[in-house]
């Protein structure tokens, strides 16, 4: 049986206390107010890991060893829909992320929304909080080592599955595939992911 892993830091008393406090707080919040953000990545070497073949045969799929810059995906999700997705070549920086929040996320927020994200350094500039609060929303960071509290994680898995199925081998095709892939996400997916992450559906 394949082993699963989890961060050893979850065993720390301080981390457990933060997670418990977050869970107590979130039970009082209407899940329709929650907006989760996160990043993921894709590259030109992505493809399916399994294939149907006649018994005794082996499929050898050419994949580039030098695939250049990773394609960063940054998106946001609500309990009833995928909110927005953008792509950019290279690593996510604080400036890039703040620009995305200002131009892509903020116009889609509503007064009273609660924006949640992890503690990545690029997420910490004060400008991000100012942008979010300017539209009447609030910003809150997830507890450390708590990706399981972010319902966008399985969305990335679904998007990457689509990318692996297409197996794009040029930059423009990879980017176009990633930008189209989120259209497979339906409201029922979002609701199931929120429920799986422990959020009560109103």
Feature-to-residue mapping (PLM):
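Short functional hotspots at interaction and active-site rims
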Residues: 1-202
């Amino acid at each position: 049986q394949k082993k699963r892993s989890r961060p050893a830091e979850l065993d720390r008393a301080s981390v457990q206390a933060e997670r418990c406090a977050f869970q107590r707080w979130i039970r009082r919040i209407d899940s329709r107010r929650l907006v989760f953000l996160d990043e993921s990545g894709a590259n030109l070497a992505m493809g399916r890991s399994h294939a149907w073949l006649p018994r005794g045969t082996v499929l050898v799929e050419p994949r580039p060893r030098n695939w250049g810059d990773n394609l960063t995906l940054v998106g946001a999700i609500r309990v009833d829909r995928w909110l927005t997705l953008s792509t950019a070549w290279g690593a996510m920086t604080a400036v890039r992320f703040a620009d995305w929040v200002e131009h892509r996320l903020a116009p889609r927020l509503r007064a009273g929304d609660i924006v949640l994200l992890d503690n990545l350094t690029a997420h910490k500039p004060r400008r991000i909080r100012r942008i979010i609060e300017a539209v009447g929303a609030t910003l809150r960071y997830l507890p450390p080592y708590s990706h399981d509290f972010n319902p966008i994680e399985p969305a990335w898995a679904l998007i990457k599955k689509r990318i692996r199925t297409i197996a794009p081998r040029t930059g423009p095709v990879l980017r176009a595939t990633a930008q189209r892939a989120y259209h497979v996400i339906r409201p029922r997916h979002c609701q199931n992911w929120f429920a799986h992450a422990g959020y009560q559906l109103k």
